[in-house]
A protein has these predicted regions:
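A structural signal for well-ordered alpha-helical scaffolds and beta->alpha junctions
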Residues: 22, 26, 91, 102-110
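Short alpha-helical
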Residues: 46-47, 67, 104, 131
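A conserved segment at the C-terminal end of the G1
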Residues: 1-4
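Conserved nucleotide-sensing/catalytic segment adjacent to the nucleotide-binding pocket
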Residues: 6-58, 63
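A glycine- and Lys/Arg-enriched "phosphate-lid" helix/loop adjacent to the NTP-binding pocket
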Residues: 63-105
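NTP-dependent small-molecule kinase module
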Residues: 100-142
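Short, charged, surface-exposed secondary-structure boundary motifs
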Residues: 15-19, 67-74, 134-136
Length: 142
């Protein structure tokens, strides 16, 4: 794709495993949102509404918790383009965040999607990796 891709984790996290200040994160995000075209990867519920308001297409990966946990396990020890360090173990705080996600985060995300549905936004929800992969494969074939 010729559309620039931004990972929110790369903006928020620093290589020394600390974070940027919230104001710095927000400033960088606003600079991205001001561009004509972009793809943003990441949850960050605090800034989600601004991103939804500014975009034309939303992809929600509403995967089962078990699949999310497996995905994190598989990535341990591997370099990633979306993180500024290599995870050496499963962070327990992150594990708990994943376990709590369906009750604490997901309802708020669906509320935002409902709020913005019918406003010219294309909203795509994938519940299995295969669904997302099929969609992306179909885009590549065009």
């Amino acid at each position: 794709s010729q559309i620039p891709l931004y990972y929110l984790d790369m903006i928020w996290h620093l290589p020394d495993r600390t974070n940027v200040f919230r104001e710095e994160f927000d400033m960088q995000l606003q600079e991205i949102l001001a561009k004509d075209r972009w793809i943003i990867d990441g949850n960050y519920l605090r800034t989600m509404e601004a991103r939804i308001a500014a975009c034309d297409t939303i992809f929600l990966l509403d995967y089962p918790v078990e699949l999310c946990l497996e995905g994190v396990e598989e990535r341990i020890g591997k370099p990633r383009t979306d993180m500024p360090w290599v995870e050496t173990e499963f962070d327990e705080e992150f594990r708990q965040w994943i376990l709590d996600f369906p009750e604490e985060q997901l309802p708020k995300i669906y509320e935002l999607l409902e709020k913005y549905s019918g406003r010219g936004k294309e909203i795509m929800i994938f519940r299995k990796r295969e669904e997302a992969e099929e969609f992306l494969q179909g885009r590549e074939e065009r």
